[in-house]
From Swiss-Prot:
Stated family: Belongs to the ATPase epsilon chain family.
One term of GO molecular function: proton-transporting ATP synthase activity, rotational mechanism
InterPro entries for the chain: ATP_synth_F1_dsu/esu, ATP_synth_F1_dsu/esu_N, ATP_synth_F1_esu_C, ATPsynth_dsu/esu_N
PANTHER family tied to this protein: ATP SYNTHASE DELTA/EPSILON CHAIN, ATP SYNTHASE EPSILON CHAIN, CHLOROPLASTIC
Biological role: Produces ATP from ADP in the presence of a proton gradient across the membrane.
Bilayer topology annotation: Peripheral membrane protein
HAMAP family: ATP_synth_epsil_bac (MF_00530)
Pfam families hit by this protein: ATP-synt_DE, ATP-synt_DE_N
SUPFAM superfamilies for the chain: Epsilon subunit of F1F0-ATP synthase N-terminal domain (SSF51344)
One Gene Ontology CC term in the entry: proton-transporting ATP synthase complex
Protein's UniProt name: ATP synthase epsilon chain, chloroplastic
Summary of subunit composition and partner proteins: F-type ATPases have 2 components, CF(1) - the catalytic core - and CF(0) - the membrane proton channel. CF(1) has five subunits: alpha(3), beta(3), gamma(1), delta(1), epsilon(1). CF(0) has three main subunits: a, b and c.
């Protein structure tokens, strides 16, 4: 038995295919979803979506949003998403280093919050690559 997973951003469909299992990063921790899961709606944090296709696991970096589960269908609406396999490791590492430097240089509450968010996004992208390496 499978689940239909659809991952959407405001600009595109990132994924629309059947999967065996997924693990989502929510605001209250990780949640695993298997076929016949109870209906559920949840807020998603910046984090990694793990997707199991048969015996293979894939990753996707999600930049926060919402998920709805019901009738073996999962709809994930996020601000942005990238498949781990599509992320350039060197570019992601450079972005992480820049985000770390920007956090150290941040002045004031607003700059610190924005720098922390950028750092979380950059870390998620790097972790998404490292999980598939």
């Amino acid at each position: 038995m499978t689940l239909n997973l659809c991952v959407l951003t405001p600009n595109r469909i990132v994924w629309d295919s059947d999967v065996k299992e997924i693990i989502l990063s929510t605001n209250s921790g990780q949640v695993g979803i298997l076929p016949n899961h109870a209906p559920l709606a949840m807020a998603l944090d910046i984090g990694i979506l793990r997707i199991r296709l048969n015996d293979q696991w894939l990753t996707m970096a999600l930049m926060g949003g919402f998920a709805r589960i019901g009738n073996n269908e999962i709809t994930v609406l996020v601000n942005d998403a990238e498949k781990g396999s599509d992320i350039d490791p060197q570019e992601a590492q450079q972005t992480l280093e820049i985000a770390e430097a920007n956090l150290k240089e941040a002045k004031g509450k607003r700059q610190t919050i924005e720098a922390n968010l950028a750092l979380r996004r950059a870390r998620t992208r790097v972790e998404s690559i490292n999980m598939i390496s």
